Amino acid sequence: FEDFTPGGTNSGLANFLVGLPDTFFQAPAAPSNIRTKATYIFGQDEWHVANNLVLTYGLRYEYSTPKSDTQGRTFSIVPGAQSTVFPGAPVGLLFPGDKGAPTGSNFPDRNDFAPRFGFAWQPFKNTRTSLRGGFGVFYDVLKAEDNFQFNGQIPFASSAFIGFDGTGVAGPFGFFSDPFGSTGSPNPFPSKPIDHSVDFASTFGPFGGGGVFFVDPHLRTPYTYQYNLNIEREIARKLTLQVAYVGSSSHGLTGLKDINPFDPATLGTANPTRILNETPGNTSSSFSFLPQFMNVANANYNSLQFSLRQQTAKVPVLGSMYYTFAYTYAHTIDFASGFRNNNSQVPFFLPQIFRSSSDFDLRHVITFNGGWDLPFNHGPEKLVKGWSLFPIVTWRTGYPFSVTAGLPASTSQPGPSGAGDRQLVNADQIAPIHYLSGNTSQKVNGTSGFFLFDPSAFSDSPTPPYGTAARNAFRLPGRTNMDLSLVKNTPIHGDRVSVRLNVDAFNIFNHTQFRSVSTNASSNIFGQVTSAYDPRVLQLGAHIIF
């Protein structure tokens, strides 16, 4: 019931009271009965080659049966194949039981062997230096969410969505008495047994669309190589320095790709055609857009890590303390940084241009944390003893971001690689980016606001296919933060009962730190701050420990 219902009252509430709907949707209960079985086998051994050298090695095997529905309610795209289970299905759409179709969402992957190897070596007799390293293969678990996309889809279940037009309708109550007849729509309810002779073209129209997701029948389990090498040296009593290289390389990562985009040669014409077309040049294709989960991406992470760790020790005058100082220089690269976010769609054409820094890439991170038992010795013992201070200090560079052209995902206006990737089109960068502080309101190009960068460096008229501004080519401001906890421990009954009081301060200096900016080149707040991290937060706590 909307305010703008055609022929309505211009009030959603009034339309509801008189029974004048704008749209009507009905769907049956369509439970998913997805089943899978997992088997994991592993073996590991440790070999003490010498007093100063230990080798650890092992092998793991994993197998998960492809997820299947107990009622066979899945389907696959296999171009050129005709279904015998549903003879009226378009060529290329197969179901369990068809030749060339998996019994579930995909064919089995029985190649998931995962070797592991590690070593620890003390090269010098004084045992103050250690060299360690390791390598391993790790397999992911395919998301069950991929299979839930079949839930409630045709031809296994029927649903109805009706948009009403008030023009020429005799009376509003006619909508409710016969919602299907009043609009000329067939009534699919009550649900009937599946008709395997149904003609898809005349009954359902082009198969696919926004509510239908497919799984590549040859989908494989994503896997990651992880490796590290580190050297640790005790440079003083209870003071240890560690330098490490840590990396990983992920392959066969799953992502969405529209496997039926419009033919680039026909884009911009009055009647563009899709690449899966029984009759080339025919604009009435049997398929709409077909988003499919596929092994379409990879990622890697490389880092150099330093740490200096002081174990608890008594320092003259200052008392007992410990701390860890750490610095990480790292780089994470991928094609897409997660499912269902802005760039989760992997383009059919030119996917390589989206390989760049990950959305969560942090190039430099410095942290310091520790504990200090305050050496108060003068005064009543229960009052001056038991005080401790715990600081956490963090400094890091900012996250990357992309400047988009502001084109929403659309099925009627596809992007360069079909439906779902229109929002991947970036703006054109026409000048070097000029970063601003964002701390005070200022006028930029005649617009006042809290700007983090000058928007005049970009144009919202992108150069085909995806604009000239690369993915994640720009950086948000870094972050400097300090949290501090003051703790008082007081024994009440010997060592059996004690009271702990603590005061915690997060962002103790109340430093304004921006976390996001408008990156839509078509927005009227483009380039302006949209959110910040929390200001100072104080927390008081009391605990009885027994």
Q: Residue locations for each model-derived region?
A:
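Short, solvent-exposed turn/loop segments enriched in Gly/Ser/Thr/Pro and often Arg
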Residues: 59-72, 134-142, 246-249, 328
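Short, solvent-exposed micro-motifs at the edges of structured domains
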Residues: 35, 52, 64-66, 186-546
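Signature of Gram-negative outer-membrane beta-barrel scaffolds
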Residues: 1-124, 341-344
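Surface-exposed extracellular loop regions of Gram-negative outer-membrane beta-barrel proteins
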Residues: 128-167, 251-257, 390-397, 402
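Core domains of carbohydrate- and sulfate-ester-processing enzymes
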Residues: 1-27, 76-89, 152-205, 428-455
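Repeat-solenoid scaffold signature
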Residues: 105-144, 223, 357-378, 383
